[in-house]
């Protein structure tokens, strides 16, 4: 219905513009329709007595030609000579005693109307179009004031259930209680309980906050109003507050109901800030109205406000006080079991081969959120489709993980034989040092295939399980493995290359962390010499030093000393396994990629061969 009215409502505007244009053009045509004759020809006609009358205007002279057998009476125009007062044409007219009429510049009535009307019409048309765009076709002359909230309709949409949400069990438990309250409010009220008026979902992007809200809508079987907070704020001051009032009025009429506002930090930012210049009238009016609506909830009204944000630190304290958003639900990054459960949910929609290990995929994706894992499953499905398979295998998940974490294969990357050999020794060094250290994570795969992120090779280690704590021995093992590539280059080829710069940077940062923050310094003892400021949950971290310059110099010296020790340890481990280093590097040059089982087999064969031959005899 709205789509049919929209062209009709604009038709009158088009007709009006056409009419004004016709008026303007008609005036121009009437004034400019008479022929223009050359100046000298007009003077000659006057002197021959062929002109009966003249009308003198500021910029031209209109001449009336006498009627003759050859032609009827007609009017012609002559452009006056600029800057000449007593011009020849005027003198000729006076000499021939032609009737002369002077006319001041006048515009026709219709032209004047058109000149006044056209700007007004254009301004009103522009304002009307802005109002229509602000309202996006909402009905009525003030339709743009109405709320843009979308009402969830279970009959038209595929409902999301709590069974479709995995990896965030604690947050899901909180929301299950909300759904239960909406279904049976009397059970809580009989004991004097009051459900929180507002629930704020807090978590990094992609963790499933909006999905949880949709699951609440699917389970509660009550009207569910959802919109983004940015839809409140428009260019007209006061429009956001009006939409807030409209939204909550609709929710109260439909109670019990749920209102969900996504990205609430768009209107809920702290007021004031940097002074008067930081004030945004429209956003603050919207926030004030939102606070007033939260305060206006009747205890007997079963309207629950849910909101989501990934920036809780910028929200106004008045929004978070008890009685408003008095329950905050943390939707954090999933742990190992949570990631495996999320992968299982997404894997329901794709055909999996029997040998696929989702637990291995979960171990290879620490720190990933639900959106990342959904992308991994989709990339695996695309990889299987590219090779023409009917099922998704483990190799497809490996390819998806590599594309996500390492980038695409660089098929056009051409390395010389010497560079290829050096990369093979480098990755073999990482892998063999990891095999030699009991506290190091197992090696899942080694590859010298170049990737688009700039890596010429990669050694992938997958932890056996996900731990919350790490020991000093485990940190030292990680650093030693990082330095194993550089040590292998020096041992096998006699000199190092720039390929180890990233390993060295990460190793240095990890050792500095041990010395300054973890209390693992040998020289400085138990002291935290740096602190982290920022929002750890959102990954916004900065390190602030809390020690003197002299202590900082000691920190630098200890970092260099311990890095040197671990480098020598990595080098000695490779000296003891020199045959294995050569064998693994040769296998990488030939095959490009070795799985963990192949790596262990090559290393074991080399070790058995060395034991059988025995150490070299002394001269």
UniProtKB/Swiss-Prot annotation:
Residues binding ATP, per UniProt: 203-210
GO biological process: protein catabolic process; proteolysis
Claim: Cell cycle is one of the keywords in the record: no
The protein's required cofactors: Zn(2+)
Enzyme Commission designation: 3.4.24.-
TM ranges: 9-29, 109-129
Periplasmic face of the membrane: 30-108
Protein name: ATP-dependent zinc metalloprotease FtsH 1
